[in-house]
Regions:
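Signature of extracytoplasmic/envelope-associated structural regions
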Residues: 1-302
């Protein structure tokens, strides 16, 4: 008897037109590194007091799906997931924060034992991007969804794009004043940011799965680490300077740019960890900018 191996696993997806309903048609293969998609159920326990002290009733309650998909960021393959994270659609290769959710059916297939878990009503609740020297650009999509079923039939898949992952060597990070002209900062050692939508299921009487998901604000926070070269970055924190941050990454042929047109630096810590170079550790929050009508603007190459 075979045990399912991670090396024989695949993810694929299709966009839903009706929340929680898998449409007809081919799924699209989704490159990934790891995932933790799972169905959970609440428990509903009886409260009767028994003379022998032992409970009699424990039932399954509300159902919901959650988990992370971790992947190397690349061209094309995750464009629909970027739309889901931003609640908007691409317009001439530009994507801004919007208000229209996008939902998926996602299949987790174990090829060696021919078992497929189908997750429905899935959307991107959080999106985290991590950049550092000597590594691929990592994206973590925190998914929330409606329900899951399991079966022995794999969905027909269209192939992924085959695009190479983006790396930090092909990227730049620029810093400047809001609505100004940012300049390349060649002293940055790392950057991470997370977009949080706070999707959550809304449960009603008569169903153990949510008829819809509610959504919160598009909150974006991140961190930047840079060599302590002068006072410029620290002054942005001290003076509460509204700052524009732009980071562009690529694969040698294609690029994607994440622009935060109006950010606030909320900390600038400089410690001494030993005899080597000192590092400034900064945190930032991205705010709505009137000129861009967004707090995050994503631009992909044509």
């Amino acid at each position: 008897m075979a045990f399912a191996q991670g090396s024989r696993s695949s993810l694929s997806f299709i966009v839903e037109s009706t929340f929680g309903t898998t449409p007809a048609g081919n799924f699209t293969n989704l490159p990934f590194s790891t995932h933790s998609l799972n169905l959970t159920k609440d428990r509903v326990a009886g409260t009767d007091i028994q003379a022998d002290r032992m409970p009699r009733v424990d039932r399954h309650g509300n159902r919901q799906v959650a988990g992370d998909i971790v992947a190397d960021l690349r061209d094309a393959d995750y464009d629909a997931f970027l739309e889901s994270a931003m609640l908007n659609t691409w317009s001439t290769n530009v994507l801004k924060v919007g208000t229209t959710p996008k939902f998926f059916s996602i299949e987790d297939y174990a090829a060696d034992i021919d078992q497929a878990r189908l997750f429905t009503g899935m959307t991107v609740s959080t999106m985290g991007i991590s950049l550092a020297p000597n590594q691929m650009v990592t994206a973590t999509y925190g998914m929330v969804g409606k329900d899951m079923t399991i079966g022995a039939t794999e969905k027909t898949q269209d192939a992924a794009s085959g695009a190479a992952p983006f790396d930090a060597y092909s990227g730049t990070l620029e810093i400047g004043n809001t609505n100004g002209t940012p300049a390349t900062a060649a002293i940055v050692t790392g950057m991470d940011f997370t977009l949080t939508n706070s999707f959550a299921p809304t449960f009603v009487i008569g169903s153990d799965s949510a008829p819809q998901l509610e959504v919160g604000r598009a909150e974006i926070e991140g961190t930047i680490s840079a060599y302590f070269e002068d006072a410029a970055l620290i002054n942005r924190f001290l003076n509460e300077t509204e700052t524009e941050l732009e980071v562009t990454v690529g694969d040698g042929s294609n690029t994607i740019k994440f622009a935060f047109p109006r950010a606030k630096i909320n900390s600038a810590d400089v410690g001494v960890d030993g005899p080597t170079s000192r590092i400034i550790s900064m945190s930032f929050v991205a705010l709505y900018n009137t000129a861009d009508a967004s707090n995050l603007v994503i631009t992909r190459s044509a």
